[in-house]
Amino acid sequence: MLDFDDVQNVLDKLPALTDASEAHGTLCGLLLGRQDYNRWLECTLEQMPDKGDLLVAERLQVLQELFEQSKVQLNTEDMSLEVLLPEEDHAFDERLVGLASWCQGFLYGLGIGGESLLEALSEQGRECLDDLLQISQLGHDEEENDETETVYSELVEHVRLSVIYMNEEINPLISSPQVH
């Protein structure tokens, strides 16, 4: 998976409407609605860049790679989805805000898919969605300590598993037929 700082650097140079966490959350929400790469770019960038520019093309290649990696991660049975967030070398409040931004982006991307996506969710799937809504409202008011770090890690894992669960409800994986 691409590094948060690398993706953030690319988005800063294009320029983007969001940070890397929110952009990745939007991407995952859009993927649940089977949206494509260009739709994600429209939601993420201030304007569509000139693809003929070599520097722009290199930057777009990074975003294309993130799109493809995320698509594969969401559509495999190994539950390998990684949530793109600031790494541990970033300040705790920055990581917490990154998680909230990721959830905001996910909700935005999922909302673009329309009401039919939400209707496909079971009661448990809607509870997952409600949890992400609550997490999207987290702020800077937590001091970092061992307990908050543990809670943060648990929230990240809950977000990851919730998205995988909702994706499975909206887009059930098609298992290959078993040969007897």
Please tell me what each predicted stretch does:
Residues 1-103, 107-180:
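Domain-length accessory/inserted modules outside core catalytic folds
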